[in-house]
Amino acid sequence: MLTTPIYRELRQLYPDARLTLLTSEGFGRVLENNPHLDEIIYHHRKETRNDLKELINQLRVQKFDLIYDIHNSLRSRWISWQLKRHAPKPEHWLIEKRTLARELQIRFGWRQFFNGRSQREQWLQPLQSYHSGKLSAKTELFPSAADKNYVKAWLKQNNLQDKSFICIGASASFPLKCWPIQNFKQLIERIIQSGASVVLVGASGEIETEELVEHFKDSQNVFSAAGIFTILQSAALLEMANAVVANDTSIVHLAEAMRTPSIALFGPTVKEFGYAPMLEQSRLIETDLALRCRPCSRTGKGTCKNRDQQICMYSISTQKVWDAARLLLPKVRA
């Protein structure tokens, strides 16, 4: 979803062009209904050599003028090279992934190699060089009317259609990125005391979310939407929320694409990597401690090497997060 500015800005600069997106099966579903794309071609991430050959032949027929390669991976470069072997040879724009800059910051704490751009802005750089004005890096998604109506029906079923609520994403792809579950429990209590409700979001089977569901099973103000919506239906739900509080995960980006302010909790990762929230009302909350071990990972994968386990997340107080969250609720009782 962070790539959506590319399609919009390409369309504005080249209104008569035909835009085709090649993406992995599953990941690209979030881009359905995008009015700037003429076609989405899905491929399996674990395709065989014959599958890849067939894909290249399918792409070659279209005779592209431009390849905008945001992956800059071995596979994407191989596909691009194959397409450039035959006339007409398309122009090839390649993204600088800043992998070395991230590794230098992780290993040595060197931040001087980052240019201050978000990842969204970084992906726009090849196009920006052809445009005098600054391109917009705001993301966008397009749930269908049916998606929105389905979510509205769920909200009505739970008497949430006219209530203020905050969505909570307590899980993450890796444990290091998770704010302590006890802190989430305390935060939810504060939200309920303020008069608002809470909707738990995420995938089905996530341990942290399931623990919160069990803990608040008798509450009339905590609801779980984990695993019951498609990706675009989830986007529609987040659009209807007052705010989102989540770990450094795709939930934050999903909400912001729908213009819902988010509070993102960062621990092993840092804003210099380019994935900080973008909206003016959104907030990135991180530890106030000067930890030499931080950042420790590009994605949050791995084990904590600090003797005070996950101090980067445990040192983020519930009060600090609540102080940010309550500003996004109407007439909140502090």
What is each residue range found by the language model?
Residues 1-334:
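Catalytic machinery of carbohydrate-active enzymes
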